[in-house]
Amino acid sequence: MKPQRTLFAYLWVSPVTVFGMFFALLAYAFGAKMKWRYGVLEVAGHTRTHWLNKLTTRYEAITLGHVILGRKHGVLKTYRSHEHVHVRQYERWGVLFPLLYVLASLLALLRGKHFYWDNVFEVEARKKSAD
């Protein structure tokens, strides 16, 4: 799980990472803890970061470029490999990834499937994190 990330990978995704850093710094200001793991900033909530828990309430964590926001570090430990697949997806698709993710959800819905569970990016993340 220790990928070699290039400067290009960081730059290609940097606009989304900057957006994620906004939430990371806000969470940190309210007591969240930050950890650098495998070239990605992981941020986990604290009792005073209830808004972060609300942001990740439906799903335990969210990836924004090279930033992963989660409810707690224990949760991040459980979902780390899944979220790191999303980081690699960002590195593949760059700033287009959020749009492609939404389009994949819409396509799943149009096919009569679930917007999250049948999203091709989530299917890939579940499969690769289980390997």
Labelled PLM ranges:
Residues 55-80, 91:
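Short pre-active-site segment immediately N-terminal to the catalytic Zn-binding motif
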Residues 79, 86-88, 103-108:
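Generic alpha-helical propensity signal that fires on short helical segments
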Residues 1-2, 82:
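Short amphipathic alpha-helical segments and their helix-coil junctions
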Residues 2-37, 43-59, 97-131:
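Metalloprotease/metallohydrolase-associated module, dominated by Zn2+-dependent proteases
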